[in-house]
Design a protein with these regions (language model features):
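Short, conserved beta-strand element in jelly-roll/cupin
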Residues: 125-143, 211-214, 219, 244-248
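Short, structured patches in soluble enzyme cores that scaffold and shape functional sites
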Residues: 119, 136-140, 149-151
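Non-heme Fe(II)-dependent double-stranded beta-helix
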Residues: 2-17, 23-117, 122-125, 273-274
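Double-stranded beta-helix
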Residues: 143-225
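Non-heme Fe(II)/2-oxoglutarate
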Residues: 44-48, 55, 214-219, 223-300
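Short, charged/polar surface micro-motifs in flexible loops or helix N-caps
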Residues: 93, 108-111, 140-143, 155, ...
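Short, solvent-exposed loop/turn segments at secondary-structure junctions
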Residues: 26-28, 104-105, 122, 140-141, ...
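A short beta-loop-beta micro-motif enriched in histidine and acidic residues
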Residues: 118-131, 205, 212, 236-237
Length: 300
């Protein structure tokens, strides 16, 4: 196996806390394959890629790349890795599937590109216990710049996504309106002002965060509230690949079409491309259905 050790395990803190870290999971050859996947996605963006440049600060995000080459590179990167066994063990799941990728680029010298505290499940139709994001950085991340998790919030309610101004996060007047609002029936409750509350009371939540080196992986449930991970003077660039997996206890939760920064035209173009490139017709899922489909790569 192209991995530094075959005895690596995912700590059960993934289940109780919502996030954990696995040190030295990937060796050099595996990282090279994962970086090839990242680089290809970066060079071949989807219609929903989001890019922002402000002076020397740059932010880029893209996901759900349906190009056939992405599938090929993904299968090459995951081949012979024990990720399926690791997740099956911690979840007690008979099966494990690979869902999709997401890529990030953050460049800043001023610590001004913190990610808003949010749940991925506020923007994606995922429900259930058996979901995991593998957050893989190709650049060293110091402790002060790690992704931050509010411990145990994956066991709590579903919040609506509420954007804020990352340059002035404690200013309530600069918070946006709930993203979905009445488009959800019934509407989800608006997310608390996590940043503002933590500024006033740093003990309001236990915060989990880890500095990482290339080869380390932060593993978390997409329902856990997370954010942060700014770049700055000592750490001006971060290239991150997030790989998503699911197991037996994974379900469909309907949400309105679209997403942060997406126009209706962008969303429709993504759906068109996915249908055009699909090798098999995806299954139609209803609320509460098991999350399944022939397009997902089974790794256990």
């Amino acid at each position: 196996m192209s991995i530094t050790a075959t005895s690596k395990k995912i700590d059960k803190a993934l289940l109780t806390d919502g996030a954990t870290v696995v040190r030295g999971l990937f060796d050099g050859p595996t990282l090279a394959k994962l970086l090839a996947l990242y680089d290809y996605c970066f060079a071949n963006p989807t219609p929903i890629a989001l890019s922002s440049v402000k002076g020397e600060d740059r932010s880029y995000t893209d996901m759900l790349n349906s190009h056939p080459k992405v599938r090929e590179l993904t299968e090459q990167a995951l081949e012979n890795l024990p990720i399926g066994e690791m997740l099956a063990e911690v979840w007690d799941s008979e099966h494990v599937w690979y869902l999709t990728e997401e890529i990030f680029l953050r460049e800043s010298k001023g610590n001004k590109n913190r990610g808003v505290f949010h749940q991925d499940t506020s923007l994606a139709p995922w429900d259930g216990e058996h979901w995991a994001n593998f957050w893989i950085s190709f650049d060293p991340v110091p402790d002060d710049n790690g992704l931050e998790f509010l411990k145990g919030t994956h066991l709590g309610p579903q919040y609506d996504y509420v954007p804020y101004d990352p340059e002035d996060p404690s200013n309530q007047s600069k918070r946006g309106k709930p993203f979905w609002g009445d488009k959800n029936d019934p509407p989800w409750q608006a997310a608390p002002d996590f940043e503002g509350i933590l500024v006033k009371d740093p003990t309001a939540w236990d915060i989990l965060s880890w500095g990482v080196e290339p080869g380390d992986v932060v593993v978390f449930h997409p329902h856990v509230v997370h954010g942060g991970a700014p770049t700055g003077p000592r750490y001006p660039r971060r290239r991150t690949l997030s790989l998503r997996f699911f197991g037996d206890k994974s379900y469909f939760k309907p949400i309105p079409p679209g997403g942060v920064g997406q126009t209706e035209e962008m969303h429709e173009e993504r759906i068109r491309l996915e249908k055009e490139r699909a090798t098999e017709e995806p299954l139609e899922m209803q609320a509460g259905d098991l999350w399944r489909g022939p397009q997902y790569l089974q790794i256990r």
